[in-house]
Swiss-Prot record:
Sn-glycerol 3-phosphate binds at K109, G140, S142, K195, D248, S258, R259, N260. This is Glycerol-3-phosphate dehydrogenase [NAD(P)+]. It comes from Leuconostoc citreum (strain KM20). The lineage of its organism: Bacteria, Bacillati, Bacillota, Bacilli, Lactobacillales. It comes from the Bacteria. The gene is gpsA. Catalyzes the reduction of the glycolytic intermediate dihydroxyacetone phosphate (DHAP) to sn-glycerol 3-phosphate (G3P), the key precursor for phospholipid synthesis. InterPro entries: 6-PGluconate_DH-like_C_sf (IPR008927), 6PGD_dom2 (IPR013328), G3P_DH_NAD-dep (IPR006168), G3P_DH_NAD-dep_C (IPR006109), G3P_DH_NAD-dep_N (IPR011128), NAD(P)-bd_dom_sf (IPR036291). HAMAP family: NAD_Glyc3P_dehydrog (MF_00394).
Length: 338
């Protein structure tokens, strides 16, 4: 039995913690909110984030990070990008007080606002190597709402430490949740962030009344942009065509369960970005990621017309119809060109 602390009791953190608990592991789910911990422990529910789910009897929640982390083999951080540094600082202090080293994992898909750093870079800066034996990422096509219902799901666990990725693989895998491993931490994180941009565009197309043809064209042409930027930044090309890349792109770009897709849907229906954000009441990671990747495209001299169009809609108030018209009116090219 492996001891695992999951930091963050949102929908995805709860779903991953519940999966590991159902697999027979000692799982402690940390939350900022004491009332949420009480609900999870007493009612075996998390109604704010997974209203229809009944959680494992083996899942224990706490608002005390030291209780969650003590003697753990793995700490899995599953908080929004904007909260990663704050939680990482608290985790570093907790590990120092406990004088304890763990395998550090995360399942957050995004880039830091302002610095555009990947999650692993943020965690590495805040948590000394003394307290982390390895750093890995969980990515791939996985909506929490489906995982908690035991829908068939496959994810990828990326990192250079094979012992660490294989341990987390064993902790999470069962008959309905299958984890694979890869060695490309950078690519796994980068592609997980990039697909959020595409999901906004895909949702916007549906909101405007376009059909599957338009969505398929968007997703396929976006793959070309993702490939070019990924290679420029040091990702492995094969990762793009695996679960962390195209797998995540498909599920996020086609499913109403995706908050980025829903954000795009609202924009396509004529709502402002502020209205969409207020209506959802949740973090839309793709909005910040769009600005980051637009800046990356200029820094690495990669032409990314779809990303540029979505950036102009989000940040320059360019009408969606005009952005689409500009994309469709570009000079005709070979399919392998941007």
């Amino acid at each position: 039995m492996t001891k695992i602390a999951v930091l963050g009791a949102g929908s995805w953190g709860t779903a991953l913690a519940n999966t590991a608990a159902e697999n027979g592991h000692d799982v402690r789910l940390w939350t900022h909110h004491s009332d949420q911990a009480v609900e999870i422990n007493h009612n075996k529910t998390n109604t704010k984030y997974l209203p229809d789910a009944t959680l494992s009897e083996q899942l224990f929640a706490t608002d005390d990070m030291a209780v969650a982390v003590k003697d753990s083999d793995i700490v899995l951080c599953v908080v929004p990008t904007k909260a990663v540094r704050e939680v990482a600082k608290q985790l570093a202090d907790t590990l120092a007080q406990l004088n304890h080293q763990v395998i550090l994992a995360h399942a957050t898909k995004g880039l830091e606002q302002g610095t555009y750093k990947r999650i692993s870079e943020m965690l590495s800066e805040e948590i000394p190597e003394t307290y982390r034996s390895a750093l890995v990422v969980v990515s791939g096509p996985s909506h929490a709402e489906d995982v908690i219902k035991h829908d068939l799901t496959a994810v990828s666990i990326g990192g250079s430490d094979e012992n660490a990725t294989k341990l987390l693989q064993r902790v999470l895998s069962n008959k309905t949740f299958r984890a694979y491993t890869n060695h490309d931490l950078l690519g796994s994180e980068l592609f997980a962030a990039l697909k959020n941009i595409v999901a906004i565009g895909s949702g916007a197309l549906v909101g405007l009344g376009y059909g599957a043809n338009a969505q398929a064209a968007l997703l396929t042409r976006s793959l070309v942009e993702m490939r070019q930027l990924g290679l420029a930044m040091g990702a492995q090309e094969k990762t793009l065509y695996e679960l962390a890349g195209i797998g995540d792109l498909i599920v996020t770009g086609m499913s109403p369960n995706s908050r980025n897709y829903r954000a795009g849907l609202g924009l396509g229906q004529g709502k402002s970005l502020k209205q969409v954000s207020d209506d959802m009441g949740m973090v839309i990671e793709g909005v910040n990621t769009t600005k980051a990747v637009y800046d990356f495209s200029q820094q690495y001299h990669v032409d990314m017309p779809i990303t540029k169009a979505i950036y102009q809609v989000l940040y320059d108030n360019k009408p969606l119809s005009e952005a689409i018209n500009d994309l469709m009116s570009r000079p005709l090219k070979s399919e392998d060109a941007l």
